[in-house]
Regions:
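Multi-pass alpha-helical transmembrane bundle typical of ion/small-solute transporters
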Residues: 2-213
């Protein structure tokens, strides 16, 4: 097969991969909706404020659900961040990105199986799955870069910036694994605090080393 034909095949395969991943993430978001408080029995009608009271009674579970949706959204954003600079893909890169998606689906399993974090396995499993999926995605990016799959318009500085920004998500998840052993509140707060600390630290390091943001 000629070089041009291979490039054309790689470009089409990348488009199909992007479409498949977007559809898969859409399905994941639909799954989260299914775990909203049940309203079919109309028991909420007897509550003082109706549906609002139902949401208040389930506020703890809803908070965890919102966090799970947010983390899935971050994973989707990470996926786009790692695919947007690419011009084409191949079988190995596609496999790595599908493995990245499988790990996100495994995160969903831990998130919806124990939304109240009754057992330690749920927060630890969620954190490790997101960390692993992020690092696999970054590994796929480095592979694609070495193979020359990136857009020709990108400079080396642009390519380095992709990895520097993408690493925040998996580092947050990996660091927050330790907070899972402290307790559910610490683990929940970790998702909000750790990224801020990491981003601030990265910017300070970039200023000291003279790197552009």
């Amino acid at each position: 097969m000629s070089r041009n034909a291979q490039n054309g095949t790689g470009e089409r395969q990348l488009r199909r991969l992007e479409t498949f991943l977007d559809v898969a993430y859409a399905v994941l978001f639909v799954q989260f909706i299914m775990y909203l408080p049940e309203t079919e029995d109309m028991a909420w009608a007897e509550l003082p404020y109706g549906l609002l009271s139902l949401l208040i009674e389930n506020s703890g579970e809803l908070l965890r659900l919102v966090i799970a949706v947010g983390l899935t959204l971050f994973s989707w954003n990470l996926t786009n961040k790692l695919l947007a600079p690419l011009q084409r893909t191949d079988a190995t890169h596609t496999f790595l990105m599908l493995l990245h998606l499988i790990l996100v689906c495994l995160f969903l399993f831990f998130a919806i199986s124990d939304p109240m974090l009754v057992t330690l396995s749920s927060p630890v499993g969620q954190s490790l799955c997101l960390a692993a999926s992020g690092f696999v995605g970054i590994g796929a990016w480095y592979y694609a870069r070495r193979q020359g799959f990136t857009r020709t318009s990108l400079s080396d500085a642009d390519k380095n910036q992709v990895a520097r920004t993408a690493v925040i998500e998996p580092l947050t998840a990996l660091t927050n694994t330790g907070f899972a052993f402290v307790g559910p509140i610490a683990w929940t707060a970790g998702w909000l605090v750790i990224p801020v600390v990491l981003i601030a630290g990265r910017r300070q390091w970039e200023r000291r080393t003279g790197r552009s943001r």
